[in-house]
Amino acid sequence: MRVLETIVALREYRKSLEESVGFVPTMGALHKGHQSLIERSLKENSHTIVSVFVNPTQFGANEDFNAYPRPLEKDLALCEKLGVNAVFVPKIGEMYPYEAEQRLKLYAPKFLSSSLEGAMRKGHFDGVVQIVLKMFHLVNPTRAYFGKKDAQQLLIIEHLVKDLLLDIEIAPCEIVRDDDNLALSSRNVYLNATQRKQALAIPKALEKIQQAIDKGEKACEKLKKLGLEILETLEVDYLECCNHKLEPLTIIEPTNTLILVAARVGKTRLLDNLWV
């Protein structure tokens, strides 16, 4: 497995590849959710490149950029064990050669980025589209793999690829859950044992909503009320029912509905969702 630290090294390596290339962009602190993306890429492509880069432009002033876990050696060991061909681990100066005021500014489309996570984390998705587009230019993948857990991010990336006419297939990957049903996240390491038990209200709320939908309930307000009753011990940022353009719904639309939740357990903010 190659560990590539510079753009020059990545470009040289990429030029040597003639068959399909799968790309899994990450911020490191890899878990079984990332592993599932990597394994799918390995299955569907001749070569797989993983990036490990904690992107500063998608963190707000009061967010956890400096505290974000960075177990690089562990991440590299997992990638090698899985059979990844190359891992791109650039420094910030490689990806952002100019100071902030000198950079070309990219903005996520407002109709997808102004609500939900975008409302809670101003500028977050602008930073996401900036780094993802840079990575796409460098890696030039056949396919790129993104988890459905970050649903709003996935929809924005799909829009980016279509809008900018990029010849890249975006492969959405199912949410991976731990044995207790909590959606896997690099931020789960922040939870102590008590907080982890409290956090289980999130998947329980979504499970209750899914059960109601399966029984025929279609009214979004009733579904949200069911979920909020279970989430009452947590600090809920939002529990929303939207279509795939992130427009609020009053009635469930089969195959075009997302139930999205963000809640805080202590200082840790967790996301989860249902694709209906």
Curated annotation (Swiss-Prot):
Catalytic reaction equation(s): (R)-pantoate + beta-alanine + ATP = (R)-pantothenate + AMP + diphosphate + H(+)
Gene Ontology CC: cytosol
Residues holding (R)-pantoate: Q58, Q153
GO molecular function: ATP binding; pantoate-beta-alanine ligase activity
Key words of the record: ATP-binding, Cytoplasm, Ligase, Nucleotide-binding, Pantothenate biosynthesis
EC number in record: 6.3.2.1
Compartment list: Cytoplasm
BP-aspect Gene Ontology terms: pantothenate biosynthetic process
Pathway involvement of the protein, from the record: Cofactor biosynthesis; (R)-pantothenate biosynthesis; (R)-pantothenate from (R)-pantoate and beta-alanine: step 1/1
Residues bound to ATP: 27-34, 147-150, 176, 184-187
Top-level class of the enzyme under EC nomenclature: ligase
Active-site residues, Swiss-Prot/TrEMBL: H34 (proton donor)
InterPro entries, per database record: Cyt_trans-like, Pantoate_ligase, Pantoate_ligase_C, Rossmann-like_a/b/a_fold
Residues noted as binding beta-alanine in the record, renumbered to the chain: Q58
Note: The reaction proceeds by a bi uni uni bi ping pong mechanism.
Protein's job: Catalyzes the condensation of pantoate with beta-alanine in an ATP-dependent reaction via a pantoyl-adenylate intermediate.
Sequence similarity: Belongs to the pantothenate synthetase family.
Subunit and interaction comment: Homodimer.
Name of the featured protein: Pantothenate synthetase
Organism: Helicobacter pylori (strain ATCC 700392 / 26695) (Campylobacter pylori)
